[in-house]
Structures are given as structure tokens and as C-alpha cells.
């Protein structure tokens, strides 16, 4: 499973429901992964003093790299959904990563990922 930036943000904010949901998913054997896009989005919006906690959380998760083929899929997502659904590059890259690896995406913002059929809405 890939977790979207919004799920990671809720964990960093100390949301107990989201944290418990993520812990339960991990304990049940789900591999929890993220896209480098999420790491960039979160670091960009973080205070310097928050970066240690952010780095620690990311180090506890597996990253799925962005490959050339991921870029192709993201371009296809943008071509198809940018105008009709206001899909942005970051979300297109996250969606493409999920598609390429056959992973579910955990997000609170399913509307940002119109091309994905395997979306999970975590507890909030």
C-alpha cells in the first residue's frame, strides 16, 4: 500500500485514529510505502524544527522510486485528468507510482486520483 501525503501529515500531527489505522495495516502484514513526491511536499511545508520527526517517520517506511516509466504514466494521467479533475503533477506522479507497482493508495482525497480504482480511505 502507498500512503498519500495527507495520511502522512495526519500521522505527523498526532491524529490517533489515523496512526492506529496505519499501525493496524502494518501489523496485518501490509507493506507501507510512499512516493518521493510525498516526502518533498511534506518537507516543503514543514518548519525546520519538525524535520527530525519527519525524517524519522520516512525512515520507518519504504520508498517506491520514480522511474522513467512512472513519468510516462504520470504524463498520461495529466493528459487525461488535468483539465477535467484539476489533477496536479504531484498527484499524477503518486497515482502513476501506485499503478506501476499494482498498489492500493491510502488517501483522504480520492478526488485527486480519478484514474485509480484501488483507493483506501483511512480512519480519520
Q: Across the structure, where does each feature detected by a protein language model lie?
A:
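A short, glycine/small-residue-rich beta-strand->loop->alpha-helix junction that serves as a flexible
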Residues: 85
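Alpha-helix capping/helix-boundary segments
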Residues: 7-8, 38, 70, 93-94, ...
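A general structural signal for well-ordered alpha-helical segments in protein cores
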Residues: 18-19, 39, 51-54, 71-74, ...
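Acidic, PIN/NYN-like endoribonuclease modules and their adjacent C-terminal/linker elements
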Residues: 95-124
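Generic structural signal for small/hydrophobic residues in well-ordered secondary structure
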Residues: 4-5, 42, 74, 98, ...
Amino acid at each position: 500500500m502507498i500512503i498519500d501525503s495527507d495520511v502522512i501529515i495526519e500521522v505527523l500531527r498526532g491524529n490517533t485514529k489515523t496512526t492506529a489505522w496505519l499501525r493496524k495495516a502494518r501489523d496485518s502484514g501490509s507493506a507501507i510505502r510512499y512516493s518521493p513526491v510525498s516526502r518533498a511536499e511534506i518537507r516543503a511545508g514543514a518548519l525546520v524544527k519538525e524535520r527530525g520527526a519527519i525524517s524519522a517517520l520516512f525512515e520507518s517506511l519504504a520508498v517506491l522510486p520514480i522511474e522513467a516509466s512512472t513519468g510516462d504514466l504520470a504524463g498520461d494521467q495529466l493528459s487525461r485528468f488535468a483539465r477535467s479533475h484539476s489533477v496536479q503533477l504531484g498527484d499524477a506522479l503518486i497515482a502513476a507510482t501506485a499503478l506501476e507497482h499494482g498498489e492500493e493508495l491510502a488517501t483522504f482525497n480520492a478526488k485527486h486520483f480519478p484514474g485509480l480504482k484501488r483507493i483506501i480511505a483511512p480512519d480519520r
